[in-house]
C-alpha cells in the first residue's frame, strides 16, 4: 500500500467514527412552543416564491429567430386565406357567368317559342278567315239563286197571289235589311286584334283593356235586360188595365128594354 492510500484510509476512519456517534446519540425532543410557532397560521396563505425559469447553460435563445418564424407562420396563414378568398371569388364569378348564360339561353328559347306560337296563331286566323269568307260566298250564292227562283215563280203566278207574295217578300227583305244592319254595326264595333308587334307588358295592358271592356259590356247588357224586363212588365200592366176597362165599357153600353137587361 502506498503512502497516499494509507493517508486516505486514516482520514476515512475518523469520519466513520463521527457518523456512528451521531447515529447513536438520541434525538432531543423539540419544545412544544417552538413547534407551534413553526406551524403556518391558517389566516395567511403561503405564497411560494416565483422562480424564473433557468436557461440551460451552453444554449443561446435567439428571440429574433422566434419572432421571424412567427411572422413567417402568420404570413403563410394570411397567404392561405387570400388564396382561399380569391379561389372562392373565382368560383362565384364562374357560377354567375354560367347563370347569365342559362338566363340568356332560356330567354332565347322563350322568344323562339313565342315566335312559333305567334306564327301558328296567324296561320290559324288566316284559315278561319278563309273558311268564313268561303262560307259567306256560298251563302250569298245560294241566296242569290233562291231569290232568282222566287222571282221567277212570282212572275209566273197570277195577280191574286202575286200581291201577297210580294208583300211577304218585302217583309223578308226588311228582316234581311235589319240583319245586314246588325252585321254592319258589329263589324264596325269589332276591331281587329293585332298583337304581333306587342311585347309582354303591352300584351298584359291589352288583356287588361279587353277585360275591362268585357266587364263594361256585361254591365250594359245587364242594365238593358233589366230595362227590357221593366218595360215588358209595364206593357203587361197597361194591357191588363185596358182589358179591364174595356170589359166595364161593354157592360155600360147595354140598355134596359122591357124591364130586362139585354
UniProtKB/Swiss-Prot annotation:
Modified residues (Phosphoserine): 2
Biased composition, class Pro residues, residue ranges: 43-55
Pfam families, per database record: Troponin
Biased composition, class Acidic residues, residue ranges: 1-31
UniProt KW Nucleotide-binding keyword: no
Oligomeric form and interacting partners: Interacts with TPM3.
Protein name as catalogued: Troponin T, slow skeletal muscle
Amino acid at each position: 500500500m502506498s503512502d497516499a492510500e494509507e493517508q486516505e484510509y486514516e482520514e476515512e476512519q475518523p469520519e466513520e467514527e463521527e457518523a456512528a456517534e451521531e447515529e447513536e446519540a438520541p434525538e432531543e425532543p423539540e419544545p412544544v412552543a417552538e413547534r407551534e410557532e413553526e406551524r403556518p397560521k391558517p389566516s395567511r396563505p403561503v405564497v411560494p416564491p416565483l422562480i424564473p425559469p433557468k436557461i440551460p447553460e451552453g444554449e443561446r435563445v435567439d428571440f429574433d429567430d422566434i419572432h421571424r418564424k412567427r411572422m413567417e407562420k402568420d404570413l403563410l396563414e394570411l397567404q392561405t386565406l387570400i388564396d382561399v378568398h380569391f379561389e372562392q371569388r373565382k368560383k362565384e364569378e364562374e357560377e354567375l357567368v354560367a347563370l347569365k348564360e342559362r338566363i340568356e339561353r332560356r330567354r332565347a328559347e322563350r322568344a323562339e317559342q313565342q315566335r312559333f306560337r305567334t306564327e301558328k296563331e296567324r296561320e290559324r286566323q288566316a284559315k278561319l278567315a278563309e273558311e268564313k269568307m268561303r262560307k259567306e260566298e256560298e251563302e250569298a250564292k245560294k241566296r242569290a239563286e233562291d231569290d232568282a227562283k222566287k222571282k221567277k215563280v212570282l212572275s209566273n203566278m197570277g195577280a191574286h197571289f202575286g200581291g201577297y207574295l210580294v208583300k211577304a217578300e218585302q217583309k223578308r227583305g226588311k228582316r234581311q235589311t235589319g240583319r245586314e244592319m246588325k252585321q254592319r254595326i258589329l263589324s264596325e264595333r269589332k276591331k281587329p286584334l293585332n298583337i304581333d308587334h306587342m311585347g309582354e307588358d303591352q300584351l298584359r295592358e291589352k288583356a287588361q283593356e279587353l277585360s275591362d271592356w268585357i266587364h263594361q259590356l256585361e254591365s250594359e247588357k245587364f242594365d238593358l235586360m233589366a230595362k227590357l224586363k221593366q218595360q215588358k212588365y209595364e206593357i203587361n200592366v197597361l194591357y191588363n188595365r185596358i182589358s179591364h176597362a174595356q170589359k166595364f165599357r161593354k157592360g155600360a153600353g147595354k140598355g134596359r128594354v122591357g124591364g130586362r137587361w139585354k
